[in-house]
Curated annotation (Swiss-Prot):
Disulfide bonds: none annotated. Its main location: nucleus. It is found in: Nucleus, Nucleolus. SUPFAM superfamilies: P-loop containing nucleoside triphosphate hydrolases (SSF52540). It catalyses: ATP + H2O = ADP + phosphate + H(+). GO terms for molecular function: ATP binding; ATP hydrolysis activity; identical protein binding; RNA binding; RNA helicase activity. This is ATP-dependent RNA helicase HAS1. The gene is HAS1. ATP-dependent RNA helicase involved in 40S ribosomal subunit biogenesis. Required for the processing and cleavage of 35S pre-rRNA at sites A0, A1, and A2, leading to mature 18S rRNA.
Length: 586
């Protein structure tokens, strides 16, 4: 609340950098319909807890929002996710001779600009059209060895520009080997979420607009038969989520014997959301001979090391651009927290959003039902917001994502489905209304702002007095936060009106109960239970934050039985999926 919140050093209501150029709008985006699967990175637990476990960092345009076409056009819309261009006149034999390295003069490891990389004219033309000249650190250190055909294990903060770091060498390889559609797939990019896959697809489209190779995306929620048809015609660069990729590999939907490059993006997140078995099967199925592998992960866990061991060739190059940094979050990010009682949390949030109405803000909550309730409540009282969570159908999620990307101001209420990798331009504020599950999630949430070089952003964390122990965990993770204070008389006290509204409006009352229940389930399943102990909550105050004068009856033992760092054992088999049947996700 810049002017209203005064920290022990003031909020600065800086204007930040100028808005990026308008995001491209594509008429070729898809209508996505399918029952939710574990590929919704915010996979949630039925009945027990509602928290989401949910997305690189391309600092470029992303494909525009899909058109809301009729059901009978679904296959055609999904087919348009693939771009096909004129075939090159190259020799098929070039595919078999390639060893993954690129021909031409060697590249200086001291290169600072893209023009120093000896890239093809077609790629350089695209990079120039996208407005890039100088490389980020991960690009400077990663692209030259990747162009030389080396395997790379990379670690970099969100917003570091690693999408270009892995796409440029992959596209150069396809170009140098003169891949044709009939040669099948030469590059596969695996990413944890549908939104991130669509975003990487948008970056690939920009980079490949002057090339003759084909490219496409396959994700859960899309029409699998339409995907099969396009894959059968030849997709040289394929972007996929793990479950859908394994589907197509097992179905024999496409030619992958000529695969030269496997890219695993956000490897730690892929494994966190339960795709360990799928990734092992994928790596086992794909050809290993002459295959270059690029594995990027924000954190180096034991599972990531195991995946690297089975997927990379011996002696990969390890690149960590963050190990010597003083802080775990990016420069230009002003981070603070406020201490607020549970019954004042919504009042403070409402006052903040009213004050910052002309800013672009993302508000993170811990559960889908809480997002649904608060977004409905805010819109009911004439504060327009967008909402994004894993209970929504894919079409709705995709439309909301692109609408917020293109907006110059506004508020997005969301779960952690939006916390990882997604590049949303010019976000001014990150508000963590519900604290994250651990410091890593905090870092990824605040990574939605201050993205790229010389950009500014601000974040605000809400903490109740009983949650102050979380600050020690942030300090241990090298996250610098300072306390923000706020004048009590500046908070809009609408509590009595809120309770009256919830008591008289049946629809909002039911939504509030669902949100309250899900909040407590999420809290009870928190991985840092020494800090976030549901038994220490003042239930009367928590209930007031949802608009109740007295707490509704809720059984919180379900959430307490499962920590969010544990994954459900039962998984639906991939392949034929049931039709969407409404509310299946919590």
């Amino acid at each position: 609340m810049a002017s209203d919140l005064s920290k022990k050093r003031k909020f600065k209501d800086s204007k930040g950098s100028k808005p990026e150029r308008a995001l491209a709008s594509s008429s070729k985006a898809k209508k996505l319909k399918r029952a939710p699967t574990p590929e919704d990175s915010d996979a949630e637990r039925d009945n027990s807890s509602d928290p989401e476990i949910e997305n690189q960092e391309p600092e470029v345009e992303v494909p525009g929002p899909p058109q809301d076409n009729s059901e009978d056009q679904e296959a055609e819309e999904n087919a348009n996710a693939f771009e096909r261009q004129d075939e090159p006149a190259g020799l098929d034999s070039a595919i078999q001779k390639g060893d993954g390295s690129l021909l031409g003069p060697s590249v200086s490891t001291d290169a600072q600009a893209f023009s120093e990389l000896n890239l093809s004219d077609k790629t350089m033309m695209s990079i120039n059209e996208m407005g890039f000249t100088k490389m980020t650190e991960i690009q400077r250190r990663g692209i030259p060895p990747l162009l030389a055909g080396k395997d790379v294990l990379g670690a970099a903060k969100t917003g570091s520009g690693k999408t270009l770091a892995f796409l440029i060498p992959a596209i150069e390889m396809l170009n140098s080997l003169r891949f044709k559609p009939r040669n099948g797939t030469g590059v596969i990019v695996v990413t944890p979420t549908r939104e991130l896959a669509l975003q990487i697809f948008g970056v690939a489209r920009e980079l490949m607009k002057n090339h003759s190779q084909t490219y496409g995306v396959v994700i859960g929620g899309a029409n699998i038969r339409a995907e099969e048809d396009k894959l059968g015609k030849g997709v040289n660069l394929l972007i996929a989520t793990p479950g859908r990729l394994l589907d197509h590999l097992r179905r024999g939907s496409f030619v992958f014997k000529n695969l030269k490059s496997l890219i695993i993006d956000e490897a730690d997140r892929i494994l966190e959301v339960g795709f360990e078995d799928e990734m092992r099967h994928i790596v086992k199925i794909l050809p290993k001979e002459n295959r270059q592998t690029m594995l990027f992960s924000a954190t180096q866990t034991t599972k990531v090391e195991d995946l690297a061991r089975i997927s990379l060739r011996p002696g990969p190059l390890y690149i960590n651009v963050d190990e010597e940094k003083q802080f775990s979050t990016v420069e230009g990010l002003d981070q603070g927290y406020v201490i607020v009682d549970a019954d004042k949390r919504f009042l403070l949030l409402f006052s903040f959003l009213k004050k910052m109405a002309k800013k672009k803000i993302i508000v993170f909550l811990s559960s889908c039902n809480s997002v649904k309730y608060y977004s409905e409540l805010l819109q009911y009282i004439d504060l327009q917001v967008l909402d994004l969570h894993g209970k929504q159908k894919q079409q709705k999620r995709t439309n909301t994502f692109f609408e917020f990307c293109n907006a110059k101001q506004g508020t997005l209420i969301c779960t952690d489905v939006a916390a990882r990798g997604l590049d949303i331009p010019q976000v001014d504020w990150i508000v963590q209304f519900d604290p994250p599950d651990d410091p890593r999630d905090y870092i990824h949430r605040v990574g939605r702002t201050a993205r790229g070089n010389n950009t500014k952003g601000r974040s605000l964390l809400f903490l109740q007095p009983c949650e102050l122990g979380f600050l020690a965990h942030l300090k241990a993770a090298k996250v610098p936060v300072v306390e923000y204070d706020f004048p009590k008389n500046k908070i809009l006290n609408v509590q009595s009106q809120l309770e009256k509204l919830i008591g008289s409006n049946y629809y909002l009352n039911q939504s509030a109960k669902d949100g309250y229940r899900s909040y407590l389930h999420a809290y009870a399943s928190h991985s840092l239970r020494s800090v976030f102990d549901v038994q220490k909550l003042d239930m009367v105050k928590v209930a007031k934050g949802f608009g109740f004068s007295t707490p509704p009856r809720v059984d919180i033992t379900l959430g307490a039985g499962m920590s969010r760092d544990k994954k459900p054992q039962a998984r639906r088999a991939y392949g034929s999926q049931p039709r969407q049947s409404g509310h299946q996700r919590r």
